[in-house]
Protein backbone atom coordinates (compact mmCIF):
# COMPACT_ATOMS: atom_id res chain seq x y z
CA UNK A 1 0.00 0.00 0.00
CA UNK A 2 2.87 2.37 0.79
CA UNK A 3 4.25 1.68 -2.70
CA UNK A 4 0.94 2.60 -4.34
CA UNK A 5 1.30 6.18 -3.13
CA UNK A 6 5.06 6.74 -3.38
CA UNK A 7 5.46 5.46 -6.96
CA UNK A 8 2.42 7.36 -8.20
CA UNK A 9 3.51 10.46 -6.33
CA UNK A 10 6.88 10.52 -8.13
CA UNK A 11 5.17 10.51 -11.54
CA UNK A 12 2.77 13.31 -10.60
CA UNK A 13 5.43 15.45 -8.93
CA UNK A 14 8.06 15.09 -11.67
CA UNK A 15 5.64 15.93 -14.48
CA UNK A 16 4.35 19.01 -12.67
CA UNK A 17 7.88 20.17 -11.92
CA UNK A 18 8.69 19.85 -15.63
CA UNK A 19 5.54 21.84 -16.43
CA UNK A 20 6.68 24.66 -14.14
CA UNK A 21 4.10 23.92 -11.44
CA UNK A 22 6.08 23.12 -8.26
CA UNK A 23 3.07 24.10 -6.16
CA UNK A 24 1.11 21.16 -7.54
CA UNK A 25 4.10 18.90 -6.85
CA UNK A 26 3.97 20.08 -3.23
CA UNK A 27 0.25 19.25 -3.16
CA UNK A 28 1.03 15.74 -4.38
CA UNK A 29 3.60 15.29 -1.63
CA UNK A 30 1.15 16.46 1.03
CA UNK A 31 -1.52 14.05 -0.18
CA UNK A 32 0.97 11.19 -0.29
CA UNK A 33 2.23 12.11 3.16
CA UNK A 34 -1.25 12.18 4.70
CA UNK A 35 -2.34 8.92 3.07
CA UNK A 36 0.82 7.04 4.03
CA UNK A 37 0.78 8.48 7.56
CA UNK A 38 -2.75 7.19 8.16
CA UNK A 39 -1.98 3.77 6.66
CA UNK A 40 1.35 3.61 8.49
CA UNK A 41 -0.19 4.34 11.88
CA UNK A 42 -2.91 1.76 11.23
CA UNK A 43 -0.33 -0.89 10.31
CA UNK A 44 1.78 0.03 13.34
CA UNK A 45 -1.16 -0.53 15.68
CA UNK A 46 -2.03 -3.85 14.02
CA UNK A 47 1.55 -5.17 14.20
CA UNK A 48 2.08 -4.00 17.78
CA UNK A 49 -1.22 -5.32 19.14
CA UNK A 50 -1.53 -8.54 17.14
CA UNK A 51 2.16 -9.47 16.84
CA UNK A 52 1.68 -12.75 18.72
CA UNK A 53 -1.27 -13.83 16.59
CA UNK A 54 0.58 -12.99 13.38
CA UNK A 55 3.56 -15.11 14.43
CA UNK A 56 1.27 -18.03 15.29
CA UNK A 57 -0.30 -17.82 11.84
CA UNK A 58 3.11 -18.20 10.15
CA UNK A 59 3.90 -21.12 12.52
CA UNK A 60 7.14 -19.75 13.90
CA UNK A 61 9.22 -22.19 15.95
CA UNK A 62 8.35 -22.11 19.69
CA UNK A 63 11.96 -21.39 20.62
CA UNK A 64 11.92 -18.23 18.49
CA UNK A 65 8.45 -17.02 19.44
CA UNK A 66 9.33 -14.74 22.37
CA UNK A 67 12.25 -12.86 20.73
CA UNK A 68 10.33 -12.62 17.45
CA UNK A 69 7.31 -11.14 19.25
CA UNK A 70 9.53 -8.58 20.99
CA UNK A 71 11.13 -7.57 17.70
CA UNK A 72 7.82 -7.38 15.82
CA UNK A 73 6.17 -5.29 18.54
CA UNK A 74 8.96 -2.70 18.48
CA UNK A 75 9.86 -2.57 14.78
CA UNK A 76 6.34 -3.32 13.55
CA UNK A 77 4.91 -0.79 15.98
CA UNK A 78 7.11 1.84 14.34
CA UNK A 79 6.44 0.79 10.74
CA UNK A 80 4.78 4.16 10.11
CA UNK A 81 8.37 5.38 9.69
CA UNK A 82 8.65 3.08 6.65
CA UNK A 83 5.59 4.82 5.24
CA UNK A 84 6.94 8.36 5.72
CA UNK A 85 10.61 8.03 4.73
CA UNK A 86 9.92 7.16 1.03
CA UNK A 87 7.64 10.20 0.73
CA UNK A 88 10.28 12.67 1.89
CA UNK A 89 13.09 10.88 0.01
CA UNK A 90 11.10 10.92 -3.23
CA UNK A 91 10.31 14.61 -2.69
CA UNK A 92 14.03 15.39 -2.52
CA UNK A 93 14.89 13.24 -5.54
CA UNK A 94 12.25 14.63 -7.91
CA UNK A 95 13.54 18.15 -7.25
CA UNK A 96 17.07 16.97 -8.10
CA UNK A 97 18.44 16.57 -4.57
CA UNK A 98 19.42 12.93 -4.99
CA UNK A 99 22.62 13.15 -2.93
CA UNK A 100 20.73 14.56 0.03
CA UNK A 101 18.35 11.61 0.04
CA UNK A 102 21.39 9.33 0.03
CA UNK A 103 22.85 11.17 3.03
CA UNK A 104 19.78 10.33 5.09
CA UNK A 105 20.06 6.64 4.19
CA UNK A 106 23.82 6.43 4.85
CA UNK A 107 23.64 8.26 8.19
CA UNK A 108 20.69 6.11 9.27
CA UNK A 109 22.54 2.90 8.39
CA UNK A 110 25.71 4.01 10.19
CA UNK A 111 23.72 4.84 13.33
CA UNK A 112 22.02 1.45 13.07
CA UNK A 113 25.39 -0.33 12.96
CA UNK A 114 26.78 1.68 15.89
CA UNK A 115 23.69 1.29 18.07
CA UNK A 116 23.47 -2.43 17.30
CA UNK A 117 27.02 -2.84 18.58
CA UNK A 118 26.35 -0.77 21.71
CA UNK A 119 22.99 -2.32 22.58
CA UNK A 120 24.18 -5.89 21.90
CA UNK A 121 27.70 -5.93 23.35
CA UNK A 122 27.65 -3.13 25.95
CA UNK A 123 24.11 -3.22 27.37
CA UNK A 124 23.37 -6.85 26.39
CA UNK A 125 19.82 -5.98 25.34
CA UNK A 126 19.63 -8.77 22.76
CA UNK A 127 16.72 -8.71 20.32
CA UNK A 128 15.17 -5.70 22.05
CA UNK A 129 18.39 -3.76 21.45
CA UNK A 130 18.49 -4.70 17.77
CA UNK A 131 14.87 -3.59 17.36
CA UNK A 132 15.49 -0.33 19.22
CA UNK A 133 18.54 0.41 17.06
CA UNK A 134 16.48 -0.16 13.92
CA UNK A 135 13.73 2.22 15.05
CA UNK A 136 16.14 4.95 16.19
CA UNK A 137 18.08 4.81 12.91
CA UNK A 138 14.84 5.17 10.95
CA UNK A 139 13.81 8.16 13.07
CA UNK A 140 17.15 9.82 12.29
CA UNK A 141 16.76 9.04 8.58
CA UNK A 142 13.27 10.56 8.61
CA UNK A 143 14.40 13.72 10.42
CA UNK A 144 17.26 14.23 7.95
CA UNK A 145 15.23 13.86 4.75
CA UNK A 146 12.26 15.82 6.13
CA UNK A 147 14.52 18.62 7.37
CA UNK A 148 16.45 18.85 4.11
CA UNK A 149 13.23 18.93 2.13
CA UNK A 150 11.89 21.81 4.23
CA UNK A 151 15.13 23.81 3.91
CA UNK A 152 16.05 23.18 0.27
CA UNK A 153 12.66 23.05 -1.49
CA UNK A 154 10.38 26.09 -1.50
CA UNK A 155 7.55 24.61 -3.56
CA UNK A 156 5.08 25.39 -0.76
CA UNK A 157 5.34 29.09 -1.60
CA UNK A 158 4.47 28.53 -5.27
CA UNK A 159 0.88 29.60 -6.05
CA UNK A 160 -0.07 26.78 -8.47
CA UNK A 161 -2.85 24.56 -7.14
CA UNK A 162 -5.38 22.12 -8.61
CA UNK A 163 -8.17 20.12 -6.91
CA UNK A 164 -6.71 17.57 -4.49
CA UNK A 165 -9.17 14.94 -5.71
CA UNK A 166 -7.65 15.15 -9.19
CA UNK A 167 -4.11 14.74 -7.85
CA UNK A 168 -5.09 11.74 -5.73
CA UNK A 169 -6.74 10.11 -8.75
CA UNK A 170 -3.54 10.60 -10.77
CA UNK A 171 -1.41 9.15 -7.98
CA UNK A 172 -3.60 6.05 -7.72
CA UNK A 173 -3.76 5.75 -11.53
CA UNK A 174 0.01 5.27 -11.63
CA UNK A 175 0.61 3.78 -8.20
CA UNK A 176 -1.99 1.00 -8.17
CA UNK A 177 -0.77 -0.74 -11.37
CA UNK A 178 2.82 -0.42 -10.13
CA UNK A 179 1.91 -2.03 -6.81
CA UNK A 180 -0.04 -4.75 -8.64
CA UNK A 181 3.00 -5.53 -10.80
CA UNK A 182 5.13 -5.86 -7.66
CA UNK A 183 2.54 -8.17 -6.08
CA UNK A 184 2.44 -10.33 -9.21
CA UNK A 185 6.24 -10.52 -9.19
CA UNK A 186 6.35 -11.55 -5.51
CA UNK A 187 3.76 -14.29 -6.06
CA UNK A 188 5.68 -15.53 -9.12
CA UNK A 189 8.94 -15.65 -7.15
CA UNK A 190 7.20 -17.55 -4.34
CA UNK A 191 5.98 -20.17 -6.82
CA UNK A 192 9.43 -20.43 -8.39
CA UNK A 193 11.07 -20.98 -5.00
CA UNK A 194 8.43 -23.60 -4.20
CA UNK A 195 9.28 -25.46 -7.42
CA UNK A 196 12.99 -25.18 -6.67
CA UNK A 197 12.43 -26.67 -3.22
CA UNK A 198 10.99 -29.73 -4.99
CA UNK A 199 14.14 -30.20 -7.08
CA UNK A 200 16.22 -31.78 -4.31
CA UNK A 201 16.03 -32.84 -0.68
CA UNK A 202 18.98 -30.86 0.68
CA UNK A 203 18.04 -27.43 -0.69
CA UNK A 204 21.09 -27.07 -2.91
CA UNK A 205 19.20 -25.45 -5.79
CA UNK A 206 17.53 -22.83 -3.60
CA UNK A 207 20.83 -22.09 -1.86
CA UNK A 208 22.62 -21.75 -5.20
CA UNK A 209 19.94 -19.31 -6.35
CA UNK A 210 20.46 -17.30 -3.16
CA UNK A 211 24.23 -17.07 -3.75
CA UNK A 212 23.80 -16.13 -7.40
CA UNK A 213 21.27 -13.44 -6.49
CA UNK A 214 23.60 -11.92 -3.89
CA UNK A 215 26.36 -11.64 -6.48
CA UNK A 216 24.09 -10.41 -9.29
CA UNK A 217 22.56 -7.73 -7.05
CA UNK A 218 25.57 -5.51 -7.78
CA UNK A 219 24.57 -5.48 -11.43
CA UNK A 220 20.89 -5.04 -10.55
CA UNK A 221 21.62 -1.99 -8.40
CA UNK A 222 23.22 -0.20 -11.35
CA UNK A 223 20.19 -0.84 -13.55
CA UNK A 224 17.78 0.18 -10.79
CA UNK A 225 19.68 3.43 -10.17
CA UNK A 226 19.70 4.32 -13.87
CA UNK A 227 15.99 3.50 -14.14
CA UNK A 228 15.12 5.67 -11.15
CA UNK A 229 17.20 8.63 -12.35
CA UNK A 230 15.84 8.39 -15.88
CA UNK A 231 12.27 8.13 -14.57
CA UNK A 232 12.60 11.46 -12.79
CA UNK A 233 14.07 13.12 -15.88
CA UNK A 234 11.35 11.51 -18.00
CA UNK A 235 8.72 13.10 -15.78
CA UNK A 236 10.38 16.51 -16.06
CA UNK A 237 10.59 16.31 -19.84
CA UNK A 238 7.05 15.02 -20.34
CA UNK A 239 5.74 17.78 -18.11
CA UNK A 240 7.58 20.27 -20.33
CA UNK A 241 6.35 18.44 -23.49
CA UNK A 242 9.95 17.71 -24.53
CA UNK A 243 9.11 14.30 -25.98
CA UNK A 244 12.08 13.97 -28.33
CA UNK A 245 14.53 14.78 -25.56
CA UNK A 246 12.71 12.31 -23.34
CA UNK A 247 13.07 9.59 -25.98
CA UNK A 248 16.79 10.27 -26.48
CA UNK A 249 17.46 10.34 -22.75
CA UNK A 250 15.70 7.03 -22.14
CA UNK A 251 17.49 5.31 -25.02
CA UNK A 252 20.80 6.59 -23.69
CA UNK A 253 19.99 5.34 -20.18
CA UNK A 254 19.18 1.89 -21.59
CA UNK A 255 22.46 1.85 -23.53
CA UNK A 256 24.50 2.79 -20.46
CA UNK A 257 22.59 0.24 -18.41
CA UNK A 258 23.17 -2.56 -20.92
CA UNK A 259 26.88 -1.83 -21.17
CA UNK A 260 27.32 -1.67 -17.39
CA UNK A 261 25.14 -4.69 -16.61
CA UNK A 262 26.84 -6.80 -19.29
CA UNK A 263 30.31 -5.88 -18.03
CA UNK A 264 29.36 -6.70 -14.44
CA UNK A 265 27.60 -9.98 -15.23
CA UNK A 266 30.34 -11.21 -17.58
CA UNK A 267 32.98 -10.35 -14.96
CA UNK A 268 31.00 -12.22 -12.29
CA UNK A 269 30.59 -15.26 -14.54
CA UNK A 270 34.30 -15.36 -15.39
CA UNK A 271 35.41 -14.92 -11.78
CA UNK A 272 32.56 -16.95 -10.30
CA UNK A 273 34.75 -19.76 -8.94
CA UNK A 274 36.70 -17.25 -6.86
CA UNK A 275 33.70 -15.19 -5.71
CA UNK A 276 31.55 -18.14 -4.62
CA UNK A 277 34.38 -19.32 -2.34
CA UNK A 278 33.33 -16.42 -0.09
CA UNK A 279 30.10 -18.30 0.62
CA UNK A 280 31.10 -21.97 0.46
CA UNK A 281 33.89 -24.45 -0.27
CA UNK A 282 31.52 -27.07 -1.67
CA UNK A 283 32.78 -27.78 -5.22
CA UNK A 284 29.39 -28.98 -6.45
CA UNK A 285 27.72 -25.82 -5.14
CA UNK A 286 30.39 -23.58 -6.66
CA UNK A 287 30.00 -25.19 -10.09
CA UNK A 288 26.21 -24.81 -9.93
CA UNK A 289 26.37 -21.13 -8.96
CA UNK A 290 28.83 -20.43 -11.78
CA UNK A 291 26.38 -21.97 -14.26
CA UNK A 292 23.66 -19.69 -12.89
CA UNK A 293 25.93 -16.67 -13.25
CA UNK A 294 26.50 -17.54 -16.92
CA UNK A 295 22.73 -17.63 -17.53
CA UNK A 296 22.45 -14.43 -15.49
CA UNK A 297 24.29 -12.54 -18.25
CA UNK A 298 21.18 -12.86 -20.42
CA UNK A 299 18.85 -12.32 -17.48
CA UNK A 300 20.52 -8.99 -16.60
CA UNK A 301 20.46 -7.91 -20.25
CA UNK A 302 16.69 -8.22 -20.25
CA UNK A 303 16.20 -6.94 -16.72
CA UNK A 304 18.00 -3.62 -17.17
CA UNK A 305 15.97 -2.98 -20.33
CA UNK A 306 12.79 -3.73 -18.39
CA UNK A 307 13.77 -1.51 -15.51
CA UNK A 308 14.60 1.58 -17.56
CA UNK A 309 11.79 1.37 -20.13
CA UNK A 310 9.28 0.13 -17.54
CA UNK A 311 9.97 2.98 -15.12
CA UNK A 312 9.90 5.50 -17.97
CA UNK A 313 6.52 4.19 -19.16
CA UNK A 314 5.06 4.38 -15.65
CA UNK A 315 6.33 7.91 -15.07
CA UNK A 316 4.94 9.01 -18.42
CA UNK A 317 1.51 7.80 -17.31
CA UNK A 318 1.49 4.54 -19.29
CA UNK A 319 1.36 2.33 -16.18
CA UNK A 320 -1.04 -0.39 -17.34
CA UNK A 321 1.13 -1.89 -20.09
CA UNK A 322 4.00 -3.06 -17.80
CA UNK A 323 1.44 -4.82 -15.57
CA UNK A 324 -0.08 -6.67 -18.53
CA UNK A 325 3.38 -7.73 -19.71
CA UNK A 326 4.25 -8.91 -16.22
CA UNK A 327 1.01 -10.84 -15.73
CA UNK A 328 1.51 -12.70 -19.01
CA UNK A 329 5.24 -13.35 -19.23
CA UNK A 330 6.18 -13.74 -15.55
CA UNK A 331 3.79 -16.67 -15.28
CA UNK A 332 4.02 -18.05 -18.82
CA UNK A 333 7.82 -17.97 -18.98
CA UNK A 334 9.23 -17.70 -15.44
CA UNK A 335 6.76 -19.82 -13.44
CA UNK A 336 5.67 -22.40 -16.02
CA UNK A 337 9.17 -22.41 -17.51
CA UNK A 338 10.73 -23.17 -14.12
CA UNK A 339 8.47 -26.18 -13.69
CA UNK A 340 8.97 -27.43 -17.26
CA UNK A 341 12.73 -26.86 -17.58
CA UNK A 342 13.70 -27.28 -13.95
CA UNK A 343 11.55 -30.25 -12.90
CA UNK A 344 10.16 -31.91 -16.03
CA UNK A 345 13.37 -31.58 -18.09
CA UNK A 346 15.63 -32.10 -15.07
CA UNK A 347 17.70 -28.93 -15.49
CA UNK A 348 16.88 -27.90 -11.92
CA UNK A 349 18.19 -24.43 -10.89
CA UNK A 350 19.76 -23.83 -14.30
CA UNK A 351 16.38 -24.47 -15.91
CA UNK A 352 14.75 -22.04 -13.50
CA UNK A 353 17.29 -19.36 -14.41
CA UNK A 354 16.81 -19.97 -18.12
CA UNK A 355 13.05 -19.53 -17.59
CA UNK A 356 13.54 -16.30 -15.65
CA UNK A 357 15.94 -14.98 -18.28
CA UNK A 358 13.36 -15.80 -20.95
CA UNK A 359 10.75 -13.85 -18.98
CA UNK A 360 12.97 -10.78 -18.63
CA UNK A 361 14.01 -10.82 -22.30
CA UNK A 362 10.45 -11.34 -23.56
CA UNK A 363 9.17 -8.47 -21.45
CA UNK A 364 12.11 -6.34 -22.56
CA UNK A 365 11.08 -6.78 -26.21
CA UNK A 366 7.54 -5.74 -25.32
CA UNK A 367 8.75 -2.66 -23.43
CA UNK A 368 10.98 -1.57 -26.31
CA UNK A 369 8.17 -1.96 -28.84
CA UNK A 370 5.74 -0.07 -26.59
CA UNK A 371 8.21 2.78 -26.15
CA UNK A 372 8.92 2.96 -29.87
CA UNK A 373 5.19 3.11 -30.60
CA UNK A 374 5.09 6.52 -28.91
CA UNK A 375 1.74 5.84 -27.22
CA UNK A 376 3.23 7.03 -23.93
CA UNK A 377 3.28 10.58 -25.32
CA UNK A 378 -0.51 10.76 -25.04
CA UNK A 379 -0.59 9.56 -21.41
CA UNK A 380 0.71 12.77 -19.82
CA UNK A 381 -0.81 13.67 -16.46
CA UNK A 382 -0.28 17.40 -16.99
CA UNK A 383 -2.57 19.53 -19.12
CA UNK A 384 -0.98 22.80 -20.22
Name each region found by the language model.
Residues 74, 108, 137-141, 149, ...:
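Transmembrane helical elements of multi-pass membrane transporters/channels
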Residues 13-80, 122-176, 234-299, 341-384:
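Short alpha-helical transmembrane segments in multi-pass integral membrane proteins
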Residues 1-45, 82-101, 193, 206-272, ...:
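Small-residue-rich hydrophobic transmembrane alpha-helices
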